[in-house]
């Protein structure tokens, strides 16, 4: 009986260890995007595109989606280095700060580009979520994105007037490689993209490139010119015909699959 019990414990431990080592770690940048606000008591708090922010401006819903798919969510409050990115499978940089948003913004520097580029080359999955040109630090962000053939344009595309949601509608074709279930999405006031090899457009609106993917070394880069799937547009606020919640699920599944594929190729 003791032998059976010991064997059972060993099997359970092995399964737990296996699940732990295969879970994808998704790290959200808190260094280039570091906005703060004061509460009613005057205390300073981080907000805007963080896992912890449960208001309209946060990514708490996206974090829940990723966890539901077996991922581990993390954040990085320091500059990306080889050591700091160790153990991260998916690294998300969203809406780097301008001086309008943060008194002393942390701009993306050459050493950051070098570290991230090597990490992607080794199999990392990088997600770049910008913003329209008036609300993102574009110059330094482009020094990073251009390492993978992607440039965020200095524009403000797909403007929406108030609650005229249809002005922000895009239609995803069936059989899309990333968005397998989402068909009608809401995405407004973004920067469009210009690309060159190795980047490829995965979604266009006429001649405007909206979403691009770049395969670099053993890794992958996903880019769109808007923070997009934060709580405001994934928690039921939009009219029912919009599939932003499905898009968030589709993108999460695709990113995790990319990370698994890249990790397998690194063996």
Q: Where are the predicted features?
A:
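Short, surface-exposed patches at the edges or C-terminal ends of soluble domains, predominantly
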Residues: 22-267
């Amino acid at each position: 009986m003791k032998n059976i019990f010991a064997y059972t414990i060993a099997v359970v431990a092995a399964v737990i260890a296996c699940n732990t080592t295969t879970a994808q770690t998704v790290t959200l940048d808190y260094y280039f995007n570091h906005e703060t606000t004061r509460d009613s008591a005057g205390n300073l708090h981080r907000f805007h595109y963080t896992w912890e922010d449960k208001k309209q401006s946060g990514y708490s819903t996206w974090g829940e989606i990723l966890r539901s798919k077996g991922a581990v969510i993390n954040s990085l409050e320091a500059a990306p280095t080889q050591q700091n990115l160790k153990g991260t499978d998916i690294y998300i940089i969203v809406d780097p700060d301008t001086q309008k948003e943060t008194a002393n913004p942390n701009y993306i520097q050459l050493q950051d580009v070098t570290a991230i580029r090597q990490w992607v080359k080794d199999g990392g999955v990088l997600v770049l979520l910008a913003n329209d040109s008036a609300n993102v630090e574009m110059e330094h962000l482009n020094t990073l994105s251009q390492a993978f053939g992607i440039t965020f344009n200095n524009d403000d595309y797909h403007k929406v007037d108030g609650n005229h949601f249809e002005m922000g509608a895009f239609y995803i074709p069936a059989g899309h490689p990333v968005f397998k279930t989402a068909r009608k999405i809401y995405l407004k006031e973004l920067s469009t993209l210009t690309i060159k090899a190795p980047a490829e457009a995965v979604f266009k609106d006429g001649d405007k490139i909206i979403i691009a993917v770049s395969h670099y070394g053993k890794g992958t880069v996903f880019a769109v010119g808007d923070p997009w799937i934060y709580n405001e547009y994934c928690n039921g606020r939009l009219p029912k015909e919009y599939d932003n919640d499905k898009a968030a699920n589709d993108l999460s599944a695709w990113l995790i699959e990319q990370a698994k594929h890249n990790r397998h190729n690194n063996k």
